[in-house]
């Protein structure tokens, strides 16, 4: 299904003259959008201006392909009335996102772009007709609702500056509008898109990537940066992402994390600790965290790098105090962190579905026995990275361009050669030294 975001990427800055008259007018932009979506377009047969699309909507056939809506989402077609100083001849454009203060961002032609080309402009909602038009093909797409409550079993995604500023398409692909958005890192870095990401999703929280190691004073400075740059949408949860830069002093690391969380709590938010289980066990006394902030753990642990839209419970990284589980980094093709809620906002009791772990999960040094079969009936067994690791292209290699895999990642082992294991595919160019692999059932 074609999406608005794809159309925007293709069209912004370009001009389209569909009827061959008067150059790239606003109607031509609307008609081109319809053609892109595979839909017929309505003509302006009364006044000759865009207002006819709305005023003749019951006669021109547009309602056969579009639904009338009162609350706009990205990709809806908006028709503007005759308003002096704003849209003096009426206008048609595509809603992009909320701009605040009674204005929206609209993608359209003949609104100031060179030679009438598509551009984004801020126009008051007061100039629009009471309803907009949403392509019926968008009917099953998720929409921003401002519902940020969390129930057990809900899904959410977490995003950073690696994702697009407009999360509409990302949320549609993931099947949820609920997000946790990266705001800051260390003491200087700020995302350039966290506000727009919040505007185009239903944020349940925001996160900061910590670099303070075991320095409690630095942790408090990082918390101050985070708190002073939050998006305007209100949330309950603020997260410290602590998965790197730990010091050798486990107690100092723990104190620093708690110092950060104390700052969050004193500002009126619910603090959450995010990391991977192996990193946490090696560097943090997490029992002290949950003693002060019960059920405040958001843990990451993946079975593999295949697309996963729902969790495989036999791979849950069991530990105390877990509220959310990031069960995959590939929630959609191309990569996207996806999470499941284990504890509702008002709950303190977590129930994990009981799954009998198969005997085949035991780690063996040979592939002769107790293996599993993949979809091609090729035997493999499963193991876990004991530390962050850069995989090699072949045994004993020293590649310049290496793929990074995080500690705690589960991998499939297909072949073993002289102390090296080929992982993830029987013909892959991914090799790990055996002494960095541990029994997956022990993690």
From Swiss-Prot:
BP GO annotations: carbohydrate catabolic process; cell wall macromolecule catabolic process; defense response to bacterium; killing of cells of another organism; peptidoglycan catabolic process; proteolysis
Q: Where is the SH3b domain?
A: 380-441
Query: Region labeled Acm domain — which residues?
Result: 145-344
Boundaries of every Peptidase C51 domain copy: 1-131
**What does the free-text pH dependence field read?**
Optimum pH is 5.5-6.0.
Membrane-traversing stretches: none
Question: Keywords in UniProt for this one?
Answer: Antimicrobial, Bacteriolytic enzyme, Glycosidase, Hydrolase, Multifunctional enzyme, Protease
Q: Which Pfam families match?
A: Glyco_hydro_25 (PF01183)
User: What are the residue positions of the site described as Important for 1,4-N-acetylmuramidase activity?
Assistant: 158, 185
As its record notes, the protein acts as a catalyst of:
Hydrolysis of (1->4)-beta-linkages between N-acetylmuramic acid and N-acetyl-D-glucosamine residues in a peptidoglycan and between N-acetyl-D-glucosamine residues in chitodextrins
E.C. numbers: 3.4.22.-, 3.2.1.17
GO molecular function terms here?
Answer: lysozyme activity; peptidoglycan endopeptidase activity
User: What influences the activity of this protein, per its activity regulation comment?
Assistant: Ca++ enhances the activity of the enzyme.
Please give the InterPro entries that the UniProt record associates with this protein. Answer: CHAP_dom (IPR007921), Glyco_hydro_25 (IPR002053), Glyco_hydro_fam25_subgr (IPR018077), Glycoside_hydrolase_SF (IPR017853)
Q: Where is the active site?
A: 26, 91
Which PROSITE patterns would you find in this protein's record?
A: CHAP (PS50911), GLYCOSYL_HYDROL_F25_2 (PS51904)
Q: Which effect does the record note for changing residue 26 to S?
A: No effect on glycosidase activity; complete loss of endopeptidase activity
Summary of the function given for this chain in its UniProt record: The endopeptidase activity cleaves the bacterial peptidoglycan between D-alanine and L-alanine. The N-acetyl-muramidase activity cleaves between N-acetylmuramic acid and N-acetylglucosamine bonds.
Stored PANTHER family = LYSOZYME
Please give the record's comment on domains: A CHAP domain is present at the N-terminus and is associated with the endopeptidase activity. The CHAP domain is responsible for nearly all the cell lysis activity. An Acm glycosidase domain is located in the central part of the protein and is associated with the muramidase activity. The Acm domain seems to require the SH3b domain for activity.
This chain belongs to the protein called D-alanyl-L-alanine endopeptidase
């Amino acid at each position: 299904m074609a999406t608005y975001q794809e159309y925007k990427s293709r069209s912004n800055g370009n001009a389209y003259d569909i009827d061959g008259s008067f150059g790239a007018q606003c109607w031509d932009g609307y008609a081109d959008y319809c053609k892109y979506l595979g839909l017929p377009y309505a003509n302006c047969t009364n006044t000759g201006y865009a207002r006819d699309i709305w005023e003749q909507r019951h006669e021109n056939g547009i309602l056969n392909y579009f639904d009338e809506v009162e609350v706009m989402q990205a990709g809806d077609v908006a028709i503007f009335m005759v308003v002096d100083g704003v849209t003096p001849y009426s206008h048609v454009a595509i809603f992009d996102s909320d701009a605040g203060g009674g204005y929206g961002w609209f993608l359209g032609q003949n609104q100031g772009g060179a030679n009438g080309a598509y551009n984004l402009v801020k126009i008051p909602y007061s100039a629009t007709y009471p309803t907009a038009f949403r392509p019926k093909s968008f009917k099953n797409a998720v929409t921003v609702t401002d519902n940020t409550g969390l129930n057990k079993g809900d899904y959410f995604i977490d995003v950073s500056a690696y994702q697009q500023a407009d999360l509409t398409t990302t949320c549609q692909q993931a099947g949820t509008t609920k997000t946790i958005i990266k705001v800051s890192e260390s003491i200087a870095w700020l995302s350039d898109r966290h506000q727009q990401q919040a505007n185009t999703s239903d944020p349940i929280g925001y996160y900061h990537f910590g670099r303070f190691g075991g320095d409690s004073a630095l942790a408090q400075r990082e918390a101050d940066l985070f708190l002073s740059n939050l998006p305007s949408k209100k949330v309950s949860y603020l997260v410290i992402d602590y998965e790197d830069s730990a010091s050798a002093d486990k107690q100092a690391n723990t104190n620093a994390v708690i110092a950060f969380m104390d700052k969050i709590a004193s500002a009126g938010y619910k603090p959450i600790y995010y990391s991977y289980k192996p990193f946490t066990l090696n560097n943090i006394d997490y029992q002290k965290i949950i003693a002060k902030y019960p059920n405040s753990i958001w843990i990451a642990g993946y079975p593999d790098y295949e697309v996963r839209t729902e969790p495989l419970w036999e791979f849950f990284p069991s530990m105390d105090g877990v509220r959310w589980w990031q069960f995959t980094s590939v929630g959609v093709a191309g990569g996207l962190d996806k999470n499941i809620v284990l504890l509702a906002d008002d709950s303190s009791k977590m129930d994990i579905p009981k799954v009998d772990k198969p005997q085949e999960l035991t780690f063996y040094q040979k592939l002769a026995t107790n293996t599993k079969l993949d979809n091609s009936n090729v035997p493999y067994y499963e193991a876990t990275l004991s530390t962050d690791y850069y995989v090699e292209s072949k045994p004993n290699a020293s590649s310049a361009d290496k793929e990074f895999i995080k500690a705690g990642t589960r991998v499939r082992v297909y072949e073993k050669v002289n102390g090296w294991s080929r992982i993830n595919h029987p013909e892959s160019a991914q090799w790990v030294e055996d002494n960095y692999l541990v029994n997956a059932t022990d993690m």
